[in-house]
Amino acid sequence: MVKMINLLVVENNNSNWDKIFSFVFDIFLFIFDVIWNTKLPMTNTSIAYFLVFFMVIKLSIYAIHGTSTQYNNLGSTVNNGVSQVYSSTVRKGINVGKNVYQNSNKQQVKKELKRQSIRYQAKNIRSTKFKGDKK
């Protein structure tokens, strides 16, 4: 039964701690399964408490010994994925924004140059008119 359970479980971490505690937990599950089926003098609630207790122990062991490898791998894959997405989308968006800003600056500069040239022409026209009036 233990081998069958181990065959069904997909193991991400093949460390010795994981194998030892998986084996111990499977043995406890087998013992409680026998107690449950043979109706030995334990109440159902006490069996449920023991099951919950050992499940908490198992999960805490995974949290302690599994974080160093599994979550680091997860974090590296998430960072790689995020950096790839960032480089493929956000940087393009930033460049588009810069181009739009540069284009708007160019347009503003062109408009300002036109205004200045119009002012300069108007000044020249006024000065020639006034010079002509004085003559």
Swiss-Prot record:
Protein topology in the membrane: Multi-pass membrane protein
UniProt keywords, alphabetically: Host membrane, Membrane, Transmembrane, Transmembrane helix
Keyword Glycosyltransferase: no
Transmembrane segments: 20-40, 47-67
Gene Ontology CC annotations of this record: host cell membrane; membrane
Cystine bridges: none
Subcellular location: Host membrane
Family that this chain belongs to: Belongs to the plectrovirus ORF5 family.
Protein name, UniProt field: Uncharacterized protein ORF5
